[in-house]
Structure formats: C-alpha cells, structure tokens
C-alpha cells in the first residue's frame, strides 16, 4: 500500500520543472510519459488509512481506549481491508441502540494538543444507506428510532450519546446522561432554530473543532437565552436527517402529525399515478414489468434497466408475490425509491415554505440567495417551473416538486460552467502577444511521432476544437508536389495542397480570430514556389501579408486580424535584393533523430546550425510572425523586433522558466514565444502547458492526438473565452511595469488571494471504467479535486471511497483552497474507481477558476478522450470568498482577528534613490487607510455572519434570511424592523427584546458603520494611491540614469529597478482592492435591502424603490482604463 502524499511522478518522458500536485491517479494513465508537472505526489498504490487522523467529511474523531477499537472490514470480494473505526461505516438511518456506551465518555480532552498534518490520508468506507430519505416522514421516523451523535462541550470534551425523538414528537432526548431523564431533554417548542455546520461559539472556540467535519456538525438553538446543543453526526446523511426533521417540527409544532399524514406529496403521487394509468389503458390495475421498467427509464434516463428490474424483483420477493405484473402501488413505491435524490430533497426543504415543493417565492429565494442570480422575479420563477416541472398540477399552480427541482438542478442552466464564458467575453483589441493561443504540434500526426500515420483529419479535428496555431512540416515530394510529414522518421506523408485546402475550409469553423500556420520549410526552391502557388490560390485574401509598421511597438490585435491567416516561417532580411537567399534551418525532426540514440540530452544550442535557401515569394508571405533564433533575454530586449517570433524546445523553455522566470515573463509581454514538445516525446505525450503559461508563453504547442491530463488542461483552459482560441493573459503579465515571478510559492503582489470552497455532495450514473478488472458492474468511486496554476496554487484533495455504488454515491465532503492568482488557476474534478490493483479512470471535468458558477451545480463528466459521458455527473456546492475583496483569508472565530496594531500592511521597498523614495513614502498613509477600510469592513461582516449562525462562506442575503425568524415574536409581530428609507438600512427595536437580539442589532449597526465608512472614504483614498502611482511612473523611463547619478552600480541598480517594479505593482494592487471592496460593499447593501423586503421585515413605507436589483455576486468588475494606471 502506498501512502497518499508519497510516491513519484507519473512516468514522464523527461524531467521537467516541478508541476502541480497531481497524482498518477490524476494523470489517469493518459498517455504514457506525460511529464512536465503531470506526475505529482500521489503514488499508484491504494491510500493508507491513517487511524490517527480525521477525514474531512468523515465524522469520526481520533479516539482512544474502547472507542478506538477497530475491526477488519471486508471488501466486495471478501478481502480483509485495513481496520477502520466502526463509526466510519454508516448504515443509515436505521441504527441499533448501543447497549454498552460508557456513561461519560470524553474522547478528547485537549484538542489543542491534537496536532495533525493538513494533508489527509484516506480510504474510508461509506456504505449506502439502508433506505433512502424521500420525505419529512422518513426523517421523523428515523429520529424516533434514534441515532448515536457526539455532543460537543465548551471544555473541549466530546461525549457519545444516543439521541432520539419522543414518540409524541414533543421532546428531544439523549442517554445515557448524568442528569435524570427528565432533564436530559429539550422541548421541541423551546427550539428557536437549527444551524448547520460549526457556527456557534462552542464550535468556534473548541480546541478540536478543526477535527470535526463541517458537513456532519449541527446545533440546536433553544430557550430564551438561545443556548446551543452542539452535535456531530457519524455522517452528513445523519446530520441532514436531524436538521430536516427538527426544522419540520419547529415549523409545524403540534400540527406535525396532521401535516405528516396529509403531506405524503400528493402532487407527486398523482403525477406518477397518471404515468401508470397512461400505460394501463385497459384499467387492469397492473402493467407488465417490461412496461414499468421502460416508463421509469423514460422518466429518469440515467437509471440502468437492470437496477430497475432488480428493485421490482426485490419488492415482489419481499411480498412472496409470484408473476411479474406491477401494480400501481408497487410502481409508485419503486419510482419513489429510485428517483428521489435525498441530497436534493434536503436542499428543497431548506427553502420550501411547504416542505414538499417550492412555490415561486421559495424558488426566487433559492435563486437569489444560493445561486447568485440577479434580476429574478416571479415571472422568471414561473418560466423555470413551466420548463422543468413534470406534473400538470405543479405547472398550473406554480409549484416545483422534487422531480421538477431535480430536473432544474441537472439541466445546463445549473451547470458549473458560467454561460457568459460560452461566448467571446474578453477584450480582443489588445496586442496579439497579450493572449494565450490554442496551439497544435505536428498537427498532421494522429499517433506517435516516429512511426505514426499522417492524416488531414488531424487538421480538421484541431481546427474544430478552436485551435489557432497549426504546424506544417513541409518536404519535397514526388511529382513536384510538396508533402507534409515528420522528417527523418517513418511517419507517413500527406500532400501539402490537400492540407491547405482543408485549412481553407475549416480555418474559421470554430473561431473568426486569426489562424497561425507554423511552416517548417525543408523544400527546394522549386517546390517552395509550388507551396506559394497553392497558398495564394486556395487561401487568397485570407493571407495576411501587410508589412509590419516599424513605428509601432506591439503586434496588431486579434480583433484587427479577424478572418486572417498568418504565416509563421523564416523570412529573408530586408537588405536581400535577390530572388532567393539563405536562412537558418530550425529542424525539429532532425533534432529528434539526432537525440534518439543519446542517453544524455544536450541543449538545443549545441545542435549545429544549418542553413538553407529560401525563395523571395515564400518570404513575402511572412509578415508579423517572422521566425528567428533566440539568443538570450538581454539581447532580445535590445534588438528583437516585435513581429519576430522565437520557438523554444520544451527543455530549454523549462530551463528559462526555472532559472529566469522574471525575464521570461517580461520577454513575453512584447514578443510571441512558441514552445514545442521535446523531440524525445516520440510517443506523442504532452508537456504540462501550465509550466509555460505561468511564464506568459503564448503558443504552447500540444499533441492534440493524445488525450489525458495535459490535454484536459488545454481544452478546459480555452473554453473560457467562447472557445475562440484566444485567452487574455492576466493583467500582471501584460502591464509594462509589474512584479511577478512565475515560480512564486506565496501570494502574488498586488493580487488578492481568494478562497475556493467546494463541497462534493454526490455522483450520478458513473459508468464502469473501460478495461477495468473483473468486478462485474461494481464501482467503488472516489473523487479528486485538483487545482492547477502557479506553484503557490497547485493542490489536490480527495474524498473517501464509496463502495459498491456507482449509480448514486453520496460523498458529502468539503474542501477549501487558497487561490493566489485566480486568473491563471484551473479546477479539475476527477472520478476514479478504487480498484484493488490499479485505480481506473471514470471521468473528469476541467474548468478555469474564472468560469466557476457559485451555488449548487452539476458537473458533467467527460471521458478520457473528451466526450460527454451520458447522464454521468457530480453534484457540488461552490462558494468563493474574498473574491475581489482583498486581504488574507480570515481564520475562524472572533479571537483571532487582527486589530490595527497587529495588522499587516502592504510594504513598499526602498530604492535608495531619494527623489523616488520620497514619492513612495507619501503612498504609505493611503495604503494604511485603504487596508483599514477594507479589513474593518470584512471583520464587521464576519462578526455579523457569526451571530447569524452562518459561516464566512455565506452572503448577507443568506444572513438576513437566517436571522429573520428570530425577529418575530410569538404572535408573528416583528420585534425588529429595518428602516430602508436611507442609503444605509438601520435596524429598529420594537419594544422590549431579548439580550440576544440586542446583540445582533448592535453588531449589525457596527457593520453598517464600517460599510458606510468604506463607501464614503474609498474614492478619496483611491485617488491618493493612484496619484502616487502616477507620480512614481514619471521616473520610470529614466530610472537607470537617475540611479546612476545617485551612485548605484550594477547589482544595486538592478535591485532598485526591481524594487520600483514591486512598488508600482503594490500600489496598483492596493488601488484595485479598494475599488473592488467598494463594489462588494454596495452589493452587500443591496442584498440587505432585498432580503428585508422578501422577509417582510422592512418598516412600512420605507422601501426604497430606486435601489437596483443586486448584481450577480461574481460579476466581473471592469479593469481600470490605462490612463488610471499611470502607464
């Protein structure tokens, strides 16, 4: 067995710079030899169970004594697995009452001493529940039977107790207890609310809170003093059952029994009955098994026929029924059992005022508070209901049943990918060098590099996928017709003319933006002229041959070059007067053949430079993509023209990326750089494109014929701008003066880190992996969440394994990632089958961070080769905090927040150039003011969220919805109202209220004051920072000469230039953060306003009709204009 976190890289073809933390499982056996960061930390063996640690998502804690006793667990083949705590294996909701629990079993006394690694080692068991939860009645029944829960106390002690609901549903009891039985209970009528997660003072201040899963924790708030009973379930399933059941009891009180009897979801039952009757046209009262199975499959296409048949047979067997006819009652029972997703039911009841369906207002609340949808109204809600609700009754009444809600959540409307990015959404008017360009290497090959066949289908496929740079390796062919193949190899040949014809047909099939033909020319003068004839005749005026403007400093934009084809190739020098001349030959194929037998790889600079004859006609087709040889960065900065392009072998590019990352980034701000795979990758494996994107390299050529992790990254990355083949690089890679190191393992100066919160809830309809072992149809899935980006962002987390359930596994595990450069980050979901011999690939989905939609989302899984897997998906929840907000992420709890004295302020560096240092010195006060405004606002908002009983992931609309029930008295008269007549909504007490509510109102007032301070002072502070930035930029052009006059030499002068760049980056970043914080604050005020109106808490007559609907919380804020940057 291999420990998670050990192990080597996936068998790469060559060593490269350390890549993201991606395991061999993450590499998914995708192309033998995938290197360049594709290896990562995970070994091929099974993960080791670490009995001392706690899995996020597993609700057991490290224990000792009798409670730590573990018994061997049998796998599906009867193989004994590593011992696991019994609390891990969940057969829910039916649990036998424990007979021998110790009376006071404190399992951990001092959590602060329980130090554990952040990297978890997991392979936990999670067996399917015995019965699906599909209604409130199921939850109540489970609670009456009882469950073992862990009771958390403020003294860092945790007690095992058996909790159950009294049969009369009036009290919540637990046993054993030191108290007598009458005191070890809470009256249901005294319960104020039920909170999910670790959102009480006891959880936040508890020393072992970090070892408790957020998904398994919940709290019962009861009594006039709002005391909390803090509990931890053995699984998120059990926690959901208790939370749902208790909330139902609170809502209906003494009427619960009546509601349960009358709320067996009559609308749903009627609809399913109607489906049955449409088949039973003769009113026989039964239908054939075949018809019953087909009907359920039509209603839920993802279900397997074998599973439906098995369920009917099990039902008949339990009734000792002969024959295969299916009655209406049996049909309804099986439909409910197979087509109810408990995780979606639990979500529905959170927002349903009826507890069995969503009306238009419930749906509006869900869309606004959870999904971040702006400008929502009842008409839009009705449209959604009419589109997705299957029952006619629901459509007529405006009700969305569990089936309609499931249909909606599984529709493309709720996919994780933001539909705004399905079209071109970026500025396409910047220089060509400011974009990443989707690029193909040896496009003509459809297999390996040495013996594989060449085919025009390679060009068709690449162009249809949005590729904007293809390669043509052209050689002399028979009958005076040039051919394309990899020279010095045994690859087959295709005629040049047929390739140009295909390019003409498909060049702009997927994108209207310019296509680059990377021409590697090895032809004689005679056949070069034939090439020119073919290109001119077939491509015509699509060819861009305009001479570059020597007065310009940057390449034209993709917008200007729409519909144009650029030739990247060698070009004769301007002083060549003849009809032909000689140029250097950059032959990738020759390099490969030279290296094939060499064990030690030399650098490309050691390969002898050859020269060949180039005809003038072909040279004249080359305009702004003239191929030149790279020498060194300082030479390029001085002599290279903006229209000249250098190509880098992967090995050489990796060397520069590791040794000269700053120079490489600066070089790519002005010039195009093409990186092609090492010639040693004869199997057509791919390098990691992120290794070179992080340095700003625009044209990273990929072997499109080889699927796997690296192509997943490439395909996923270029989806973010309408799949047009061009993606605008991060601002920090484009701005003339900016400080950025490609290999940073810390936060990026001037860029706000953001926290990505991902909860993997469930999976649906996972197919059996191709070529997997002899396990029949058994699938034991688990999920990896990977972050790809700069080294500081590369990370991965995995869920537990759910054994023998590929149809509807429940994971319920939450992960958190800090993203330091969001514009270059990608998220990859990988589903694997936990096979005993080698984990098999099931599916994956890769998405740029900037394309994530927050809220509850489905992730459509794709196969190894990129095809969508029918009906296979992950159900996840996504939240992003500190997005455009700035500052380091806050830790949990009030006690760890930093006051002004301990607050960390952005620091500026000293250049030791007096005049320049004076300017930067003047920037320190506004930087401090900006930090104080932002952090005071953030701290106040977090304090209010905590008092509302929510985590920092929640938004203020959710906070207002959560706290609104507390503001109502026993007769539903408001104890607190919001005055919305002014810009800053105020809370007003209505008579005498409990101290707990006074505390909420006081905290709310403090939050409003911090929001007000930021809004009213942000503009002035922003202008001061921008003014200092502009003043400093006046020294930029002559900084070297000024430093020399000050006596700085060589190293110190270079250090001064670096410090100047750092300071400018910090100033720009601080200005941006303040601007974003103001936008966030205005959004917060809008959310408060509309939540108050939605809950009916606004003071009559104070609603401000002029307030606009809140923008989507993730709406991209436009970048500042260049005149604000001081450039």
Swiss-Prot record:
Locate the C2 domain: which residues? 734-863
Residues recorded with modification N-acetylalanine: 2
Function statement: May play an role in the regulation of Ins(1,4,5)P3 around the endoplasmic reticulum.
- Positions of post-translational Phosphoserine modification: 17, 1113
Which taxonomic lineage is given here?
A: Eukaryota, Metazoa, Chordata, Craniata, Vertebrata
Is-annotated flag, keyword Transcription? no
Alphabetical GO CC annotations of the entry are: cytoplasm
Q: Which ranges carry the PI-PLC X-box domain?
A: 426-570
Q: At which residues is Phosphothreonine found?
A: 84, 584
Descriptive protein name:
Inactive phospholipase C-like protein 2
Q: Does the keyword GTP-binding apply?
A: no
What top-level branch of life does the organism fall under?
Eukaryota
Which gene name does the record give? PLCL2
Q: Which residue stretches belong to region Disordered?
A: 1-128, 1101-1127
Basic and acidic residues: compositionally biased ranges: 1106-1127
Please list the residue ranges annotated as the PH domain.
141-251
Q: Return the Gly residues bias intervals.
A: 1-11, 32-42
- GO molecular-function terms, A-Z: GABA receptor binding; inositol 1,4,5 trisphosphate binding; phosphatidylinositol-4,5-bisphosphate phospholipase C activity
């Amino acid at each position: 067995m291999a420990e998670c976190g050990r192990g080597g890289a996936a068998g790469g073809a060559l060593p490269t710079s350390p890549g993201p933390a991606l395991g061999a499982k993450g590499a998914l056996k995708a192309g033998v030899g995938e290197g360049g960061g594709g290896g990562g930390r995970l070994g091929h063996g099974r993960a080791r169970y670490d009995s001392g640690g706690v899995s996020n998502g597993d609700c057991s804690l490290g224990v000792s004594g009798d409670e730590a006793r573990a018994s061997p667990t049998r796998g599906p083949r009867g193989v004994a697995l590593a011992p696991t705590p019994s609390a891990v294996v969940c057969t829910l909701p039916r649990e036998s009452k424990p007979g021998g629990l110790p009376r006071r079993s404190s399992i951990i006394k001092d959590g602060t001493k329980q130090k554990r690694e952040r990297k978890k080692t997991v392979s936990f068991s999670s067996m399917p529940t015995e019965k699906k939860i599909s209604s409130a009645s199921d939850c109540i029944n489970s609670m009456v039977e009882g469950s073992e829960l862990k009771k958390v106390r403020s003294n860092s002690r945790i007690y095992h107790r058996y909790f159950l609901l009294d049969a009369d549903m009036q009290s919540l009891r637990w046993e054993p207890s030191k108290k007598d039985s009458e005191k070890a209970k809470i009256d249901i009528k005294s319960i104020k609310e039920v909170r999910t997660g670790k959102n009480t003072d006891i959880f936040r201040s508890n020393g072992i809170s970090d070892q408790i899963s957020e998904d398994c924790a919940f709290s019962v708030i009861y009594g006039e003093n709002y005391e909390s009973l803090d509990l931890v379930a053995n699984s998120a399933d059990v926690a959901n059952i208790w939370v749902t059941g208790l909330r139902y009891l609170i809502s209906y009180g003494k009427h619960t029994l009546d509601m349960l009897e009358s709320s067996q979801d009559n609308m749903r039952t009627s609809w399913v009955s109607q489906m049955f009757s449409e088949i039973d046209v003769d009113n026989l009262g039964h239908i054939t098994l075949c018809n019953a199975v087909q009907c359920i499959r039509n209603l839920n296409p993802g279900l397997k026929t074998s599973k439906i048949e098995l369920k009917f047979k099990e039902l008949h067997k339990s009734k000792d029924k002969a024959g295969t006819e299916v009655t209406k009652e049996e049909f309804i029972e099986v439909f409910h059992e197979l087509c109810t997703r408990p995780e979606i039911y639990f979500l529905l009841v959170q927002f349903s005022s009826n507890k069995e369906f969503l009306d238009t207002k419930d749906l509006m609340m869900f869309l606004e508070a959870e999904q971040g949808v702006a400008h929502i109204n009842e008409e839009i809600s009705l449209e959604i209901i009419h589109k997705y609700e299957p029952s006619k009754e629901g459509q007529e009444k405006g009700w969305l049943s569990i089936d309609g809600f499931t249909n909606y959540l599984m529709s493309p409307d709720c996919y994780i990918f933001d539909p705004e990015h399905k079209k071109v959404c970026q500025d396409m008017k910047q220089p060509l060098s400011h974009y990443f360009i989707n690029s193909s290497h040896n496009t003509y090959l459809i297999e390996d590099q040495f013996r594989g066949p060449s085919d025009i289908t390679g060009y068709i496929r690449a162009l249809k996928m949005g590729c904007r740079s293809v390669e043509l390796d052209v050689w002399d062919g028979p009958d005076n017709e040039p051919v394309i193949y990899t020279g010095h190899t045994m690859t087959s040949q295709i005629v040049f003319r047929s390739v140009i014809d295909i390019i003409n047909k498909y060049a702009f099939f997927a994108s209207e933006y310019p296509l680059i033909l990377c021409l590697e020319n090895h032809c004689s003068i005679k056949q070069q002229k034939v090439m020119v004839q073919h290109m001119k005749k077939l491509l015509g005026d699509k060819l861009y041959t305009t001479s570059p403007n020597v007065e310009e400093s940057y390449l034209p934009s993709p917008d200007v070059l729409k519909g144009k084809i650029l030739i990247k190739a060698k070009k004769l020098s301007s002083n060549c007067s003849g009809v032909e001349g000689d140029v250097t030959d950059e032959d990738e194929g020759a390099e490969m053949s030279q290296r094939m037998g060499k064990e030690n790889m030399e650098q490309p600079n050691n390969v002898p430079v050859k020269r060949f004859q180039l005809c003038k006609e072909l040279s004249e087709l080359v305009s702004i993509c003239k191929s030149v040889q790279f020498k060194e960065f300082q030479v390029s900065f001085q002599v290279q023209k903006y229209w000249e392009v250098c190509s880098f072998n992967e090995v050489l590019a990796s060397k520069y990326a590791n040794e000269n990352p700053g120079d490489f980034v600066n070089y790519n701000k002005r010039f195009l750089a093409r990186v092609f795979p090492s010639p040693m990758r004869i199997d057509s494996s791919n390098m990691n494109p992120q290794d070179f994107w992080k340095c700003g390299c625009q044209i990273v050529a990929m072997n499109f014929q080889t699927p796997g992790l690296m192509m997943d990254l490439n395909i996923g990355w270029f989806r973010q701008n309408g799949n047009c083949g061009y993606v605008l690089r991060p601002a920090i890679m484009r701005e003339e003066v900016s400080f950025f190191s490609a290999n940073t393992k810390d936060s990026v100066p001037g860029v706000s880190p953001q926290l990505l919160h991902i909860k993997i809830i469930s999976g649906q309809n996972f197919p059996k992996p191709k070529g997997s072992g002899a396990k029949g149809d058994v699938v034991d899935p688990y999920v990896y969440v990977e972050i790809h980006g700069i080294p500081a962002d590369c990370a991965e987390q995995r869920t537990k394994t759910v054994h023998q359930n590929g149809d509807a596994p429940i994971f319920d595990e939450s992960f958190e990632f800090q993203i330091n450069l969001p514009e270059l980050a990608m998220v990859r979901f990988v589903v694997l089958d936990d096979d005993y011999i080698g984990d098999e690939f099931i599916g994956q989905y890769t998405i740029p961070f900037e394309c994530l939609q927050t809220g509850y989302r489905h992730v459509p899984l794709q196969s190894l080769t990129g095809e969508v897997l029918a009906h296979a998906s992950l159900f996840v929840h996504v939240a992003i905090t500190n997005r455009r907000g700035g500052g380091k992420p806050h830790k949990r709890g009030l006690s760890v927040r930093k006051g002004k004295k301990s607050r960390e302020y952005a620091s500026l560096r000293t250049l030791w150039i007096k005049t320049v240092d004076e300017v930067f010195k003047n920037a320190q006060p506004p930087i401090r003011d900006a930090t104080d405004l932002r952090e005071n606002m953030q701290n106040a908002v977090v304090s209010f969220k905590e008092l509302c009983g929510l985590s920092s992931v929640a938004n203020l609309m959710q906070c207002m919805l959560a706290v609104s029930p507390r503001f109502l008295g026993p007769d539903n008269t408001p104890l607190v109202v919001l005055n919305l007549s002014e810009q800053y909504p105020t809370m007003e007490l209505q008579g005498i209220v409990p101290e707990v509510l006074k505390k909420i109102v006081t905290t709310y007032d403090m939050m409003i004051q911090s929001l007000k301070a930021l809004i009213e002072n942000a503009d002035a502070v922003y202008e001061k920072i921008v003014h200092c930035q502009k003043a400093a930029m006046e020294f930029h052009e002559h900084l070297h000469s000024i430093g020399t006059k000050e006596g700085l030499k060589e190293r110190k002068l270079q250090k001064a230039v670096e410090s100047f760049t750092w300071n400018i980056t910090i100033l720009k970043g601080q200005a941006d953060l303040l601007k974003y914080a103001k936008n966030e604050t205005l959004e917060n005020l809008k959310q408060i306003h509309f939540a108050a109106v939605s809950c009916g808490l606004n003071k009559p007559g104070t609603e401000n009709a002029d307030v606009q609907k809140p923008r989507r919380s993730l709406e991209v804020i436009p970048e500042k204009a260049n005149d604000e940057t001081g450039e």
